[in-house]
Regions:
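Charged, amphipathic alpha-helical stretches
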Residues: 1-64
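Conserved C-terminal RecA-like helicase domain
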Residues: 93, 122-124, 146-147, 162, ...
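Conserved pre-motif I regulatory segment
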Residues: 61-157
Length: 469
């Protein structure tokens, strides 16, 4: 029978390492493993200083499976120990959500197998790839085999807001612990690689909060007394092929480093940063964290580069808690995309922008109506954001020849000054027929502002709205 030709793959279909760990628990997907773990009651420790999630996971193991309860206990005690260490100076101790705990547990399992016998791990991954993964209808079947050289790179595809930074801190300790147990070669440096100086400063403060020795990278410190004793933070723009006034040659770091990469593909053009990471970890190891691996691959215009990146992250991604899982668990945001047919229609533009303000007002009224929203869920007051493509430059779509930011400021000025006109827009938007239609003939805002239409907005508010927004 002829081999079925697959269409262009998506990264989520190619996460063979992630599924290799899942099958050790007898599960084919994250939902099957986590179904009974999501209750917040399972967060934190029991009276025996063991993770409650560890005990729940023990119930999922089958007697003849590859993982034992003793192994899970060993891994859990590492996680508990390292969590205690980063909690030492915190007023509010960290309690891992199920997806954070599983990220750390998967890391324990992987590092144990990697340090114990990398050749055996490589063999087991390839056997799983050929005997299981490539026979699933929902997976991508064209990944190349693993080599031992592939194994010193791990990636975590975790959504923004899911706690990637705290995982990084524990990952450092996990790697150091297994390197100690297996008498691995001493690391030259521990490096956190960021896309910019702002994120470098943020990592510095967060590592300090986790009670970890940390320093901002300095050219003068290369080869200095404190080399390897602290986590060093450097943004990718300070690395170069040769030394410069503000840059240091990547060769100066040697190759036996532990490198932790935060959103690396956002910091340097092309694949330069990936080459630097490769040089930094030739004899070492790297952990990489991003919410946008899939988008980064799709953005590659060169087919060869896209495939290389696709294969690399397909084989390196240890845990997938990307946005679809994040959203399904009740995090993230609901959104609507409403494109305007004609940017040059002032009446249409005013209607759309007024609708935006009305939406913000509606959310604010609901927020103020019940303080339990804040007290129980720690939700802050709604925030409105305008995102434009230009601050100084003139937007080509804009007939008034002003920047996007100026356009919004002019709208807000008109909104405040012309109360009668914009009160009319508000009344139209709150009526059953606003006059705006989609291409299919449906009302654009017909199903919007249901809370206001249902009574949150009294008649006096319609007049006060223009004054107080």
């Amino acid at each position: 029978m002829a081999k079925k030709i697959q269409k262009k793959g998506k990264l989520q279909q190619a996460l063979v390492l992630f599924h290799y760990i899942l099958q050790l628990f007898g599960c084919k997907d994250l939902e099957a493993l986590s179904r009974d773990l999501k209750d917040p009651a399972y967060e934190g420790l029991n009276d025996d200083h063991e993770s409650k999630l560890y005990h729940e996971l023990c119930h999922k193991l089958y007697a003849t499976g590859p993982l034992s309860i003793e192994q899970l206990y060993f891994y859990d005690q590492h996680i508990v120990k390292f969590t205690d260490e980063i909690n030492e100076k915190r007023s509010e101790p960290i309690k891992w959500k199920y997806f954070q705990y599983l990220s750390l547990l998967f890391t324990e399992i992987y590092l144990d197998q990697y340090f114990s016998n990398p050749q055996a791990l490589c063999h087991n991954l390839n056997r799983f790839l050929h005997d299981d993964f490539n026979h699933r209808a929902e997976t991508w079947h064209e990944l190349p085999d693993f080599t031992v050289d592939d194994l010193n790179k791990l990636a975590y595809w975790n959504a923004t807001g899911s706690g990637k930074t705290l995982l990084m801190h524990v990952n450092i300790k996990q790697y150091q612990e297994y390197a100690r147990i297996h008498h691995a070669k001493k690391l030259n440096r521990i490096i956190v690689l960021t896309p910019n100086e702002g994120l470098s400063r943020q990592h510095y403060e967060e590592l300090k909060a986790s009670n970890m020795d940390v320093a901002m990278f300095s050219k003068q410190g290369v080869g200095g007394l404190f080399q390897g004793k602290a986590v060093e933070i450097i943004d990718i723009n300070k690395l170069a092929d040769k030394d410069g006034d503000k840059t240091v040659a990547v060769e100066a770091f040697e190759g036996n480093n532990l490198v932790l990469v935060d959103e690396g593909h956002k910091g340097s053009s092309g694949d330069v940063w990936m080459g630097y990471r490769q040089k930094l970890t030739e004899e070492g190891f790297s952990f990489e964290y991003s919410a946008t691996f899939g988008q980064a691959i799709s953005a590659k215009s060169n087919a060869k580069d896209r495939k290389a990146m696709f294969d690399q992250y397909g084989k390196a991604t240890l845990f997938d808690y990307s946005y679809r899982y994040f959203y399904a668990d009740g995090y993230g945001k609901d959104y609507r995309i409403m494109n305007m047919n004609d940017w040059n229609d002032d009446d249409l533009l005013n209607m759309y922008l007024t609708a935006y303000l009305l939406c913000l007002y509606e959310q604010t009224k609901i927020y103020q109506s019940d303080m339990r929203i804040h007290n129980r869920f720690l939700v802050e007051k709604p925030l409105g954001i305008f995102v434009g493509s230009s601050v100084k430059a003139v937007s080509k779509e804009n007939k008034n020849q002003v920047s996007d930011v100026t356009q919004i400021l002019l709208f807000l000025q008109d909104f405040i000054r012309n109360r009668t006109e914009f009160s009319g827009y508000i009344r139209r938007l709150l009526s059953s027929e606003d006059g705006l239609k989609t291409k299919n003939g449906y009302s654009v805002f017909g199903n919007s502002f249901l809370a206001l239409k249902g009574g949150y907005l009294v008649e006096d508010d319609k007049q006060k709205f223009a004054e107080n927004i």
